[in-house]
């Protein structure tokens, strides 16, 4: 208890010499010149540079990242429009060719005019639809994988009498059908 700790604002003995030298020479340090601040700035700068380099590497390897669903739909409409406009129709022959191309261009322009306002008003809707589609695809894939696993493993799972997929080869589930009575129900043996 006889030891007293210096107040927290007081410099440590090794820092006291540096503070005295600074005061003696008239140099001052700003808040940005503190050792911790410059280290943090250097660290942030290095992290930002690394992140930009990684993004550039991925763009070079995989191409530009996909945009929002609205942008992707807009690109799809433009691509389809370009392909349809450039098609030569062999069915219509040389006589109807220019007229048919004009009709196709007009239809494409009308489709673009109808789609653009919807995309502009509801860009988030397409992101939500894309997310919902991804969830549906995942659910479908899971169901198909489970069914394929069941088909390929030889059906070693225990049979559930209430599951219509588990009926035996005769199409029955093991319950007594009775004498083929007049009603649509099945006879249940209570004894």
From Swiss-Prot:
Basic and acidic residues composition bias: residue spans: 11-26, 147-178
Induction behaviour: Transcribed at low levels from its own promoter. Transcript includes downstream gene glk. Expressed when grown on glucose or galactose, levels decrease as cells enter stationary phase.
Superkingdom, natural source: Bacteria
UniProt xrefs under InterPro entries: DUF5304
Keywords associated with the record: Carbohydrate metabolism, Glucose metabolism, Sugar transport, Transport
Residue ranges, annotated region (Disordered): 1-42, 145-191
Record-level GO BP terms: glucose metabolic process
Protein purpose: May be involved in glucose transport or metabolism.
Complexes and interactors: It may form a heterotetramer of two glucokinase subunits (glk) with two ORF2 proteins.
UniProt name for this protein: Uncharacterized protein SCO2127
